Amino acid sequence: MQTIKVRGVSGLLAYRVLARTVNTALLILVLLMAAATAARAEPVTIVVLGDSLTAGYGLDADDAFPARLQVALAADGVDAVVINAGVSGDTSAGGLSRLVWSMGDAPDLAIIELGANDALRGLAPDATYENLSAILQWLDDQRIPGLLAGMLAPPNMGEDYGRAFNAIFPALAVNHGVPLYPFFLAGVIGEPRLLQDDGMHPTPEGVELIAAGILPFVVQALGAVVVN
């Protein structure tokens, strides 16, 4: 009888230890899940590295592309902070020179909108390609997802230049494996009501159209980071 009693007590103690272990494990699991949920609840961060088309030349800050993209994302159920890293007049070389500090603490996505001023100045397409390639390579090295916004050369630059320049962006997208929004000014350029008096920079209505056009590409590029 004594042996049976000892075994019963031992079994009870073992059960209590097991129960405490399971409860502790469950508590840890709940805490981890809560932490993960809180982390996912944080807004995603997007940096737009660009020129005056990003900076919002001639516009109020709330009408600039990054601000309107943030509003468009929110309307689509994506909680995001879109940072304006645009500098008017900037070229691909200028964007490369300020790349590291512009990216800050590794955003969830970097949108690269550069090249328009390269074309307007007639800079060598090969140089533009190399600068943008270096930007995309750095993003890849830092494991920052990128989205490339394409640009087209103005017709007055001539067919040869236009052919060489326009081929830059599809080639970069293929060679670096990044998504491409083919033409940043799609639906806006050539539409006077959507352009400022200079015929180059979009009005607030033009920016709204740009944000709406690129929105699906941004959401797709964010991928698993986005929690609706």
Predicted regions and their residues:
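Residue-level micro-sites within transmembrane alpha helices that shape
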Residues: 19-22, 116-117
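Serine-esterase "nucleophile elbow" of acetyl-processing enzymes
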Residues: 40-88, 98-106
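N-terminal secretory signal peptides that target proteins for export/translocation
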Residues: 1-20
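Oligomerization/assembly interface segments of phage tail-like spikes and tubes
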Residues: 3-4, 36-39
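Acidic-and-aromatic substrate-binding clefts and catalytic sites of carbohydrate-active enzymes
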Residues: 89-93
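Bacterial N-terminal signal peptides
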Residues: 21-35
